[in-house]
Each structure stands twice: as C-alpha cells, then as structure tokens.
Amino acid sequence: MAEKVLVTGGAGYIGSHTVLELLEAGYLPVVIDNFHNAFRGGGSLPESLRRVQELTGRSVEFEEMDILDQGALQRLFKKYSFMAVIHFAGLKAVGESVQKPLDYYRVNLTGTIQLLEIMKAHGVKNLVFSSSATVYGNPQYLPLDEAHPTGGCTNPYGKSKFFIEEMIRDLCQADKTWNAVLLRYFNPTGAHASGCIGEDPQGIPNNLMPYVSQVAIGRREALNVFGNDYDTEDGTGVRDYIHVVDLAKGHIAALRKLKEQCGCRIYNLGTGTGYSVLQMVQAMEKASGKKIPYKVVARREGDVAACYANPSLAQEELGWTAALGLDRMCEDLWRWQKQNPSGFGTQA
C-alpha cells in the first residue's frame, strides 16, 4: 500500500517539484495550499499540480487550505492517515519580512505550532521541515556546515525558521517517538527539465534568478543588483544556487531517513559552490542568448555578502548529492521561462 504524505504549501515552486518526485518514488502526496505563493488556474487543481499530473500520469489529491485554519487541518487529519508531513507552507520573502515581521511570525510560527499539535493528536510524528540557510545569519566561516552557530539571523524570515527549528528540536527531545529532518535550503533555482513547471512568483520576484529570466524574456526592463561593494570577487553577493530538482530529491532522501527512527536531524541542501550575482547574470545570458541589462542600487537590508554550504553531511547520511550544475540550472530555467513567458497563466 503506497504511503500517504501530507505536503503543506505543495502548489508552490519547491513544493510542486517535490510532489512530482514523491509520485515518481511511489508515494501518495496529499497537498494543501492557500495560493499565497501559487497560481490558481481555472481547474480544480492548482495549475502547477495539474501539470505534475500530466508529467507523471499519476493523480494528486489537493485541498485548498490555510495552515492557520485549525478546524480544516483537524478534518484533514481525520480524513487521511499520513505516514509523514513535508512542511513547506509559510511566508518567504526576506525583504518583506523586515517590513511585516508580525505577518511572518503569525503565519510561520503559529501555523507550524498548530500543525505540530494536530500531528501529535493524530499520532503522525514524522516531519520533514523546509528550513533555510538564513538561520546561520552572517557567516562566521565558509563553507557553512551544520555545526555553524544559528540564531544570529539578520531578518524576521530567518528568525522564524530558526524558532521553528528550535521548537522541533525541543519536541523531539521531549518525546522520543518523534522523528524530524530539518533541511536548510540554500538558493533553489532552475525548473523541471520538461519546462512545464517552474518558479512563477506572484508579483515582483524576490529571488534573483526568476527576476533575471523575466528580464531576459522582456517582462522586466532591467535587473536591480543590490550592492556591488561587498567583500567578494566582483563586489556582488555570493550564494549557493541549487537546482530545484536536486532539492526536491533531497526530500525523498529525508523521508527514507525518517524510517530509521532518526530523532531530529539537520542537513544543508546546497552544492558547496558559491556564485556571485554577476556570474549568475552571465550564465543566464549564455543559456538564453539574450543580453541582460542591470543597474546597481543600494544594498538590501538583511542581506549577507556570501553564503554557501558544506553539503557533506547530507551526502554521508542521506546518500544525497546535488547532481545538476550551473549551466543546467540556467538552461532549465530558460526553457521554463520561454515556454511560459507569463508563468502558469500563459495561454497555450
């Protein structure tokens, strides 16, 4: 009997790619989403998941739901028997979190507490949590390994992820029947090789690469480069970009880890290589054959100069490694953008 996995926020960018990998691995994903960061489309399924069904030939169960809606979550856990929960749902824009801290704490913290309480009440004690490299704050050393101090976060988004990590650690400490894998993502980019699903930001993109690809396709005039006076090779911010398909596969490896009664485990999901903003622009120009105009503007509050992973623990303990390099990330991202110039709302 295939195991049911609840995926919160599963219609979004990372969520939809993970749902596809879950289906390919033989799981039965049940997805909830409130469309805050996902395109609705005209059918009964979010457009991203409708396309996932087409790509896999398998069906996805979906319910529109907000993780702050306790009654709806209760009904969901009564209806289904879940083996595990993969928790993506939450607000995720660093800059916005500085402007709207309460929103971030309400959705990310309260939503997660409610989810954990309902999981506990129904005896579902296996969790994969979508955390972030922002929990490390300003790096004291690079590459970042899991032993690097956390909590010196530079923005409320990162703090909310840090607080949730601490809650889950405390929960696993207090009740040894809980198992949790906390995945600290670096910077996901790229798209499924088919070009059918990808990142479709609702509004102005907060992340570099969707913005770059929208400039390349002509949706936006020029890229704003936030600061060129960082202590990096070319003065622009350096990040560890990871292909979203590699990232999604990391969640399948994490589910396998839960079966070992692993307690609380934490892993970086990154490539171990940092690229600057200007290197990413050049790589995208190469993949698209387009010139990408940019202008340098002031630094963005809460940004760090450089951040990249030591991913060796995930390689050792999860048997996971990032297989897709920079060229492939940009080629796949460009294919998605070209086939879907207006994102999921593109009319065929």
UniProtKB/Swiss-Prot annotation:
The keyword Chloroplast does not apply. Changing residue 313 to M: In GALAC3; 6-fold decrease in UDP-galactose epimerization activity; very mild decrease in activity towards UDP-N-acetylgalactosamine. NAD(+) binds at residues 12-14, 33-37, 66-67, 88, 92, 161, 185. Disulfide bonds: none annotated. Pathway: Carbohydrate metabolism; galactose metabolism. Substrate binds at residues 132-134, 185-187, 206-208, 224-226, 239, 300-303. GO terms for biological process: galactose catabolic process; galactose catabolic process via UDP-galactose, Leloir pathway. GO terms for molecular function: identical protein binding; protein homodimerization activity; UDP-glucose 4-epimerase activity; UDP-N-acetylglucosamine 4-epimerase activity. Contrary to the human enzyme, the E.coli ortholog (AC P09147) does not catalyze the epimerization of UDP-N-acetylglucosamine to UDP-N-acetylgalactosamine. Compared to the E.coli enzyme, the sugar-binding pocket of the active site is 15% larger for the human enzyme, making it possible to accommodate the acetyl group. Homodimer. Belongs to the NAD(P)-dependent epimerase/dehydratase family. It is linked to Galactosemia 3: A form of galactosemia, an inborn error of galactose metabolism typically manifesting in the neonatal period, after ingestion of galactose, with jaundice, hepatosplenomegaly, hepatocellular insufficiency, food intolerance, hypoglycemia, renal tubular dysfunction, muscle hypotonia, sepsis and cataract. GALAC3 is an autosomal recessive form caused by galactose epimerase deficiency. It can manifest as benign, peripheral form with mild symptoms and enzymatic deficiency in circulating blood cells only. This is UDP-glucose 4-epimerase. It comes from Homo sapiens. The gene is GALE.
